[in-house]
């Protein structure tokens, strides 16, 4: 859910796109590495259940990536907060965004940290 409507300058859009694309590329590369590892464990037709499990994993992984990486400007602060919390981006990746946007991203990332610490 968007926290508020932001106006994004051309320079901010470029900064946001670079940070977003870099994190997305890293996520896709990690998924491909894991896929190759899982495929390598399937040795024969006797492992057919592993093949169907791979299909299920791939479907869930794609949904997870699609859900996490939403490039609508209305939700980018939440997206960046999650990526910051997960370590997929650093605050330096956001330099070029207006201070109030970075502050909002930090605030939301703090909420993620608080929730994670409560879960243990």
Question: Where are the regions that the model predicts?
Answer:
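Acidic, Ser/Pro/Thr-rich low-complexity regulatory regions
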Residues: 1-120
């Amino acid at each position: 859910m968007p926290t508020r409507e932001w106006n994004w300058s051309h320079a901010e859009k470029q900064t946001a796109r670079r940070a977003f694309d870099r994190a997305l590329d890293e996520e896709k590369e990690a998924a491909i590495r894991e896929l190759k590892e899982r495929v390598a464990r399937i040795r024969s037709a006797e492992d057919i259940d592993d093949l169907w499990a791979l299909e299920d994993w791939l479907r869930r992984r794609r949904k997870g990536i699609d859900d996490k990486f939403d490039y609508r400007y209305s939700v980018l602060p939440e997206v960046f907060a999650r990526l910051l919390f997960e370590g997929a981006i650093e605050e330096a990746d956001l330099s070029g965004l207006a201070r109030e946007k970075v502050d909002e991203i930090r605030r939301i990332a703090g909420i993620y940290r608080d929730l994670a610490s409560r879960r243990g």
